[in-house]
């Protein structure tokens, strides 16, 4: 049995890919997306091998009760936790009853564990090295249909069914706050183009009109990436897609941006994180405030929609900084491009994070909290933490509101707290950019409401 608790509103690639490996080896595999379907106790109790996918922090916290239940109902089962957040939380996972902890490129190790289990052998230790795998086409049979997952809302109000895949894994960069870094250590691995294209074709046949590439950075290998885009667009000319690309890479590979636009790229997500150069240096992001402005201009000139994401609240933020962030988003005409949840994101500090290397952060940190799987931090200015709570509450009560309306309310609130004059409101109007109805976020503390809802 393979279990996912949350995968950003996508049909879980982290179940479909290992399912292909296990089924090829002759195993009967049940895939359960617990964000969509009930986890049946009878299935848990009868499984020989239980794998729980942990691709992000929210999924990991939600997995705790699932793992405990599996161990209680099925003491002899071999329980594996796999994915980016498994190695980061290994002691906690083992305390819950997990037998095996796998990080990146987990498919071959899962298959090896299954092979040893079927032969009655003790599981052999897995390597700490990141292997180079020849992947299989993900097997999505048994998963909920794509129509039950996030959709892409177009500017004209129509919606597209969304599929997802990965053209590469890991990342060659070392951003301090990123969960990829402790696992991949600056390495990335490409997925063979024929595998990616076959996965896309299968999802198009299943109704997908849009594909989200889940790569941490699509331009880690730009030649590989564009080969896939060119082939995909040739085979499916009406298929749109979105990708995630660093600001640094948007500048380095600016010549490729028009090709993305011409190939039906709906938008490019980029983790801007902050507009403060000092904070960007702390995070080791590889770009500056000015670089962000250049990327905005380059994307506009190429006809690409840039969707910036932020870690809006962090220990170095001032009220004035937050007002500047909001004002800049408005001045650059990016209000419709930013999911309101991005304005409430708070820095997450998990175990093994490179953030723990920063002397400038240590003074703000408390002891590791097993309940939240992170190091809690308190801002030196209590007004900042109070603002974060209020912005989070505001966003949570405006889930169906126009983005401009929400941003106007947040700007007014922030300027009031900072003792600044009220801003000129951003003119109203419907969103003129496509967006997913399950906002993308990472490297962040989950909204408590998200945890309760899921």
Where are the model-predicted features located?
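Acidic, low-complexity intrinsically disordered segments
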Residues: 1-205
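Radical SAM enzyme core and accessory elements
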Residues: 1-3, 23-24, 31, 43-52, ...
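Residue-level signal for short, function-critical loop segments
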Residues: 6-7, 56, 217, 247, ...
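Hydrophobic positions in alpha-helices of CheY-like receiver
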Residues: 22, 66-70, 74, 228, ...
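Hydrophobic anchor at the start of a short beta-strand
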Residues: 28-30, 77-79, 211, 241, ...
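Short acidic/polar active-site loop segments enriched in Thr and Asp
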Residues: 48, 99, 209-211, 266, ...
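Radical SAM [4Fe-4S] cluster-binding motif and immediate context
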Residues: 144-305
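A structural motif corresponding to the C-terminal lobe/cap of the Radical SAM core domain
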Residues: 222, 233-412
